[in-house]
Structures are given as structure tokens and as C-alpha cells.
A protein has these predicted regions:
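N-terminal single-pass transmembrane signal-anchor helix
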Residues: 2-33
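Intrinsically disordered, low-complexity segments enriched in polar/charged small residues
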Residues: 9, 43, 49-50, 81-83
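Generic N-terminal initiation segments characterized by hydrophobic and/or small/turn-forming residues
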Residues: 5-9, 18, 48, 87, ...
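Functionally constrained cores in energy, signaling, and assembly domains
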Residues: 14-16, 24-25, 45-50, 54-57, ...
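Periplasmic/extracellular, small/polar-rich flexible segments of pilin-like filament-forming proteins
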Residues: 57-160
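Membrane-proximal N-terminal amphipathic helix
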Residues: 34-64
Length: 160
């Protein structure tokens, strides 16, 4: 009588092949998700810079510039008359706008806000940092890796 079924060797070969394919797939998927998060973060940075530059231009043409869906405070006074305290307040309003109105979360840890105060030196992974440490400019920085040197920074000058 002939037994039907697979031998132990055949089963072990199949399990080994599945294991190798799974290991390769996990590495490839990990690289794919890292690249997608990095690209999303860089895109968020570029969009926020374009948004701020266009809003700052409104001030130059006599229009009003509001943040946080609030029509109560025109930010143009902070843009057109920069100083250390006004730039600092503008920075805080920008951070609040991106976190609350846009609902930004940290791409690598969605329990954290997506935007915070900081510069290229102290911008942590996954954040779009806004710095207003110099009275005539806003600095937007994004850090897309654990390595501190992997960041993109853009300076937006005030007082158009």
C-alpha cells in the first residue's frame, strides 16, 4: 500500500522558502514605509512654507492674514513690524494653526503634534519645526531621520 502525502523533507523545504520570502518582504516593506513617511514629511514642509509665504504676501497688498480660523487678530502687524516679541508670538500662532486647524500629527508617532517650536539644531524626527528666534525671519525646519543632519530648513523673511 502506497502512502499519500508529503515527506518531512518536502515540508521543511517549503517552510524554509516561505521564511526566506517573508524575511525579504519585511525588509522591502520597511524601506517602502520609511520612504513614504520621509516624502510625506518633506511635502508637508514645502506646503507649509508656500502657505506662509502666500499669507505673508497678503500683508504686503493690504489684505488681512489670519491664523487658527480666528478672524479676531490680523497677523499682518506681526509680519510687517517684526521684532523679537512679535516674531515669537507669530511663531506660536503658526504652530498652533498647523496643529489645531490642519490637525497635523507627527508622522512617526501620531500621538504627538506635528509642528512645534524649534530650529535646525533641535528639531526632532517627524516634526515640522517653526523658529522665530531672530526678529526679522521665521525658520521652518523638518527633520526626517534620527540623524540630526538629515533636515531641510527654509528661512522666510518678514517685513515685505
Amino acid at each position: 500500500m502506497k502512502d499519500k502525502g508529503f515527506t518531512l523533507i518536502e515540508l521543511l523545504v517549503v517552510v524554509a522558502i516561505i521564511g526566506i520570502l517573508a524575511a525579504v518582504g519585511v525588509v522591502a516593506y520597511s524601506g517602502y514605509t520609511y520612504g513614504a513617511k520621509k516624502n510625506a514629511l518633506i511635502s508637508r514642509h514645502e506646503l507649509s512654507v508656500k502657505f506662509l509665504m502666500s499669507e505673508f504676501q497678503k500683508c504686503n497688498t493690504g489684505q488681512k492674514f489670519y491664523l487658527n480660523n480666528s478672524q479676531s487678530f490680523d497677523q499682518c502687524s506681526r509680519v510687517l513690524n517684526p521684532g523679537s516679541s512679535t516674531t515669537k508670538n507669530l511663531t506660536k500662532s503658526i504652530i498652533s494653526h498647523f496643529n489645531n486647524v490642519n490637525g497635523w500629527k507627527n508622522i512617526y508617532d501620531n500621538t504627538l503634534a506635528g509642528s512645534k517650536e524649534g530650529s535646525a539644531k533641535n528639531c526632532e524626527k517627524g516634526f515640522v519645526c517653526v523658529g522665530g528666534y531672530v526678529s526679522d525671519r521665521i525658520t521652518k525646519t523638518v527633520n526626517y531621520d534620527d540623524v540630526q543632519s538629515n533636515f531641510i530648513s527654509k528661512i522666510i523673511f518678514l517685513d515685505y
